[in-house]
Every structure is written in C-alpha cells, then in structure tokens.
Amino acid sequence: MFIMSNNITVSVIIPAHNEERYVVRCINSVKRAAERVKCGVEIIVVCNRCTDRTAELAAANGAVVVTDESRCIATVRNTGISAAKGRVIVTIDCDNRMTENTLREVLGRLNSGKYIGGGAQVKFERYSFPIRVNEIICRLGFKFTGLYCGIFWAEKSTFKAVGGFAEKKAAEDIATAINIRRYGKKEGKKYGCLKNNHLINSTRKFDEMGDWLYFRLAFRNAGALIKAALGDSSDYDKLIDEMFYDYNDRKRENDLSVQS
C-alpha cells in the first residue's frame, strides 16, 4: 500500500471502470502530489465492474483496491470513502490527473479553518477551438454558481455529515457540491476552489468522437434535456449510460475485436 508516512491523513479516492489504460497515470500524479506533503497519503482505487487489468495494475502500483458493482458513480465514490483511513478525502476520476501541489493546497485550505471543502478548476490535456469553448463554458458555470467540482476535497466527517456523494445517476457532482456548501454555511465555513492547482482533464472522448462532441450531444438530445429539466429523466439517463457508464465497455469490446 502506498503511504508516505506511518499515519494516514489523506485518502485519495479513484473510481475506476475498466481503466487499465489510465489508472497508473492517475496514481502516479497522486504520488507526485503526495511527495510534497508531510503526512501519510493512501490511494484507494474503487474497481467498478472491471473485467480488465485495472485492479491488478492499481495494486501493483501501491493502491488499496476495493470493489463496487453498482451503476452509479456516486455510490462507487462512497464505497471508497467508507474504506478510507484518512481524515481528509480527495476524489479524482481515473482518466484525469492532479497537479503536483494539489494535496499541499488542499491541506492548507482545510487547516486554515476557513473552508469546509471544495473543488478545482479544470484544464484539458490538449486544446482546440471547440475544447477551449467548452472550457470557457465550464469556467463561467463554476464562477457564477460557485459550485466547483472536478477534484472534490473535504474532511471525511464532512462527507459523513452530508450523507456522502448524492447517489444520483447524473449531476451527482453538482448536488454534492450544493450539499457540502450548505453544510459549510451552518459551520461558518466556505466552499472553495483551489487557486494554484487544477484538474488535468482527459480528452479521450474528444479524441475518439470529435472536439465538438458535447455541443453535438446537446443539440441532438435537446428533448431529453428538456424532459429531464421538467422531471422526467428517463431519456437523459439512457444518454448518461451511453456516454459514461457504458463507454469503457464499448471501448474495450472494440479493442478486443481489433486484436482478434
């Protein structure tokens, strides 16, 4: 198990569904960040319905491996939080990376007593005009709502107080940010955003399906989005399954068919 010292202070939770291509890269980014703090850091990879080498690679690279078979990313993250030994929880998706001073800044903000928790700005690992537009839209949304996501950070006691990640199939990150911010107000603390570090966001879906991907999806699925806004999320849930929960399954099937 990867621990920078005997006493674990920080637990980094990485949910993973068939992520053998990305899990080592993500773990290594956490290790680099862990080298810059003077406390114990554990890495927990939550293997979700994995049929590839994700668990094997995660364990070989020092992560604690736990499993969860649900089809809800929030539930997967909550499984990792339940297994965590650290006082501080940080979550990051497996295809993404954190910058090297992320954990140091997280600890500084939480130890200041001013912050209940928060998120981070997002920067993509490559850029084009449509990806830049996508980033601008995300940044504007974060700025006007104050609900920063990407990398979540808070004390484990805070996640326990709000019931963990909101167990919704979609927009669970926004719902969780709202819950943590609301709880923070009661405690006299702010929901914040890292200023000097950020999430390095994977562009794998853009690489495979084109850089205008999310604009095309929004246009083609406008009806599903409107129905979801009015309370009927059935069509939207199918879209979420296709683009997220089943994405790696399709990718793996395609890779295996090419190899055969």
What are these regions (language model features)?
Residues 68-84:
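Glycine-rich, basic loop-to-helix element that forms the pyrophosphate-binding segment
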Residues 89:
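Short aromatic/hydrophobic "clamp" motif used to bind/position activated sugar donors
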